[in-house]
Amino acid sequence: MARSVWKGPFVDGYLIKKVQKLMESGKSEMIKTWSRRSTILPIFVGFTFSVHNGNKFIPVSVNEEMVGRKLGEFSPTRTFHGHGADKKVKRK
């Protein structure tokens, strides 16, 4: 079920503060975050976030098409190593 419109998008408060500080200073640093649940806002466009995937930080550079989605959608948590080989074929 989607979030109610009257509640608005969820973003951790410290994330907005970090973006505003970088906007004032004019620097283009990576913003390190564990907040995969935060929604991407229009003020985030052009910034690069390091989003934690449980093991390491994945760099995510935000563009206009990402607005409204979550930061965690762009740093996958699982790696696919392929299906196991068919053991019946190897025996022959």
From Swiss-Prot:
GO terms for biological process: ribosomal small subunit assembly; translation. InterPro entries: Ribosomal_uS19 (IPR002222), Ribosomal_uS19_bac-type (IPR005732), Ribosomal_uS19_CS (IPR020934), Ribosomal_uS19_SF (IPR023575). GO terms for molecular function: rRNA binding; structural constituent of ribosome. PROSITE patterns: RIBOSOMAL_S19. The keyword Coiled coil does not apply. Gene3D superfamilies: 30s Ribosomal Protein S19, Chain A. NCBIfam families: rpsS_bact. Belongs to the universal ribosomal protein uS19 family. This is Small ribosomal subunit protein uS19. The gene is rpsS.
